């Protein structure tokens, strides 16, 4: 029986970032409007904080296919962290689409988080409780929710909207170009 859970604030970090993302086996799809250099707890004996990009780089080494859609160029701190993990350059598939405002994490096409939180420390609840945003979202394995979410992600990925998009001059990654 499918399970669906409503998450707020710190729960997004605990369930979507610390549990859902590490459970990926084959493919990880992430969509966000904003992306920053988020630091997360690395699973293990010590509570070491590492860049979320390190977690993604480790998943790539394990053979996970990762796709990222984001709406704007990340800032210098993110790019600096990105450069620390050379496997990300060739391993992560990325599309910049300035019209993307939906936020989701889809794991193996079977489980997903979707909601208001951008892929930032404040958005995903990774920051101190007095510094994080007020966010909410849904964590689910219900195919009735995961499948249309994956279709929305894939339609943007494929460029299904690019032909009629009025913002192509701002889009550096249009698949139709």
Question: Model segments located where?
Answer:
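Short, conserved active-site loop motifs that form the nucleotide-linked donor/cofactor pocket
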Residues: 3-4, 91-93
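A conditional alpha-helix N-cap/helix-loop micro-motif detector
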Residues: 9-10, 46-49, 94
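Primarily the HKD phosphodiesterase
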Residues: 20-89
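Short beta-alpha junction loops
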Residues: 70-75, 99-100, 143-144
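Short, electropositive alpha-helical surface patch
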Residues: 79-91, 167-176
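Short solvent-exposed loop/turn micro-motifs enriched in small/polar/acidic residues
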Residues: 95-99, 131
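Short beta-strand scaffold segments in enzyme catalytic cores
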Residues: 103-106, 136-138
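Signature of lipid phosphatidyltransferase scaffolds
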Residues: 111-177
């Amino acid at each position: 029986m499918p399970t669906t859970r409503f998450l707020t604030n710190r729960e997004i970090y605990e369930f979507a970032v610390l549990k859902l993302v590490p459970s990926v086996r084959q493919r990880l799809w992430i969509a966000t409007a904003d992306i920053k250099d988020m630091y997360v707890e690395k699973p293990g004996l010590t509570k070491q904080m590492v860049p979320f990009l390190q977690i993604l780089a480790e998943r790539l080494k394990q053979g996970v296919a990762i796709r990222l859609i984001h709406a704007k160029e990340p800032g210098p701190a993110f790019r600096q962290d990105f450069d620390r993990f050379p496997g990300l350059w060739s391993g992560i598939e990325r599309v910049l689409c300035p019209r993307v405002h939906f936020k989701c994490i889809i794991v193996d096409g079977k489980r997903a988080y979707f909601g208001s939180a951008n892929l930032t420390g404040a958005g995903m609840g990774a920051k101190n409780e007095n510094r994080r945003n007020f966010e909410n979202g849904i964590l689910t394995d219900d195919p009735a929710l995961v499948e249309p979410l994956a279709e929305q992600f894939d339609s943007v990925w494929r460029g299904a909207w690019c032909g009629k998009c009025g913002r192509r001059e701002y889009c550096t990654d249009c698949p139709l170009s």
